[in-house]
């Protein structure tokens, strides 16, 4: 499901290398601090995933979401909002104080997060540098 969502618009990620994909998913799920959630429909089909980890920070423990997606054919029908609410309940029960994530400001997911109560962290900026 991850590949089918993120290789389409608006992301168009190239996950054609299965070894790189396996390593990435292992990075996200194979650590002691990993925290993964799945959303299943009434037929027990996986329709959403959240891949992240627990981070201990001075202001409290957080859930950092690295990847969150809803199956493409289920987007726009409330599944994502339901999933976010369920994740909020679950991490609250764990005693976590915040959910943090990054997204591209030019994709529909950005507005989705705003509509679901996330606020932009304007005091931070992300940097990257290619070293090839």
Question: Model segments located where?
Answer:
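Conserved beta-strand in the GNAT
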Residues: 36-38, 45-54, 64, 69
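Conserved GNAT-fold acetyl-CoA-binding loop/helix
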Residues: 3-25
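Conserved acetyl-CoA-binding loop of GNAT-fold acetyltransferases
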Residues: 105, 114-123
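A conserved beta-turn-beta hairpin within the catalytic core of GNAT-like acetyltransferases
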Residues: 45, 55-65, 75, 121-123
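A short helix-loop-beta-strand connector motif used in the catalytic cores of GNAT acetyltransferases and
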Residues: 26-38
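Conserved acetyl-CoA-binding loop-helix of GNAT-fold acetyltransferases
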Residues: 70, 76-89, 114-115
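Conserved beta-strand-loop-alpha-helix junction that forms the acyl-donor binding cleft
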Residues: 75, 100-110, 128-132
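Conserved GNAT acetyl-CoA-binding A-motif
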Residues: 84, 91-104
């Amino acid at each position: 499901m991850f590949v089918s969502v993120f290789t389409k618009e608006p992301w168009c990620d190239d996950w054609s290398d299965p070894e790189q994909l396996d390593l990435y998913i292992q990075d996200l799920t194979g650590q002691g601090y990993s925290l993964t959630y799945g959303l299943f429909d009434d037929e027990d089909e996986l329709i959403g995933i959240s891949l992240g980890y627990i981070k201990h920070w001075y202001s409290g423990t957080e859930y950092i979401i690295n990847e969150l997606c809803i199956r493409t054919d289920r987007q726009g029908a409330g599944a994502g909002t339901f999933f976010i609410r369920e994740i909020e309940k679950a991490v609250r029960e764990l005693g976590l104080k915040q959910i943090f994530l990054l997204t591209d400001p030019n994709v529909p997911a950005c507005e989705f997060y705003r509509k679901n109560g996330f606020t932009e962290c304007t005091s931070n900026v992300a940097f990257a540098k290619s070293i090839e």
